[in-house]
Amino acid sequence: MDFFISTKNRTDKEELMDDFSIGGDLLRDTLDKLENINRWLGGNLVTVNSLKSVLKNHPKEAEITIVDIGCGHGDILRDVAKFGRKHDYKFKLIGIDANPTAIIYANELSTEYPELTFKTEDIFSDEFKNRKVDIVLATLFLHHFKEEQLVSFLSDTLKQTQKAIIVNDLHRHKLAYYLFMLLSVFIKNKMIINDGLISVLRGFKRKDLEIMSQKVNVKPQISWKWAFRFQWIIQK
């Protein structure tokens, strides 16, 4: 745990969660606790509210295919499903994650949501690139990749997406780092503490998102949200 840090540039340190072989009780406990932390801080609402904005003028009788990349155990998609049911949308929801244990757990937790399916899949694979979807969700996911990977991925994904890519990710800021360090005193999970601090340092400044927007030739729609999140909506 580093006390003196710089947020000028994104770190290239890897998180423990980048190892897709991690599974068992450790991963399940990590995903459960992350869900609780994100709900407490209001992070999941950033994604749902972004979706609400994108669907503002969408006819409710038309089916909407939404893919959540890096879905973990599916908490975001279950929130999206609840939103869809409440507002009478016809959602087809697909969760994708490279960790097979996460996908198994997502299926176990989503038996009451027939509109959800989960798949173990690599977002850089041809299988993913051949998907045709309306909306792609990326919540606390893009910071796992380097800028050149993200520019390539976003360029390809825009071609297969009919409406929008919705990004909800971390603001790289010293205060966010130290606040998480303080919060970690109450977290009984070493994986979350390690990865949470690295995640902040792998996060983004507004300028990073603006530069990537230019590179993929889209008009940036970037808003800062609590707690140290950037909402980045890329609409077609």
Language-model region placement:
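A short, conserved alpha-helix within the catalytic core of class I
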Residues: 145-156
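C-terminal alpha-helical "lid/dimerization" subdomain adjacent to the S-adenosyl-L-methionine
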Residues: 170-213, 222
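Conserved beta-strand signature within the Rossmann-like core of class I S-adenosyl-L-methionine
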Residues: 161-170
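A conserved beta-strand element that flanks and buttresses the S-adenosyl-L-methionine
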Residues: 137
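Class I SAM-dependent methyltransferase SAM/SAH-binding core
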Residues: 67, 73-75, 80-125
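Class I SAM-dependent methyltransferase Rossmann-like catalytic core
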Residues: 24-50, 54-55
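N-terminal, positively charged/glycine-rich alpha-helical extensions of SAM-dependent methyltransferases
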Residues: 1-32
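Conserved Class I S-adenosyl-L-methionine
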Residues: 206-236
